[in-house]
Amino acid sequence: TKTADFTVAATESYLINNKTTTSCVVTLPTASSWSGRSLNFTNYQAQTLVSASSNVVARTGGAAGTAILAATVGAWAQIVSDGSNWLTIAGS
């Protein structure tokens, strides 16, 4: 459970955003170093979760941005590295 901005560790794959006051910023691993690996995020607070870099592609496609989770309690997303970016493959 994360209560402040954070960097994803090599041993983590399920991450809970529990930061209460502002958007939570996550530094994702470089997509090229984690090709094929997935990460799962869930919101326990009504705060957005965003990447520190523009490297997340929405389920609808398009250019990579920073958005991972909306500011909704219970929001969740699964992202997978394609070697270039993190692709959102499932979520609410």
Question: Which role fits each region the language model picked out?
Answer:
Residues 39, 64-68, 77, 86:
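Polar low-complexity intrinsically disordered regions enriched in Ser/Thr and small residues
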Residues 1-58, 82-92:
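Exposed extracellular interaction/assembly regions and N-terminal maturation sites
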Residues 72-82:
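Extracellular disulfide-bonded cysteine-rich modules/repeats
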Residues 55-71:
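Terminal beta-strand-rich extracellular "head" domains
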Residues 30, 71-72:
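Intrinsically disordered, low-complexity coil segments
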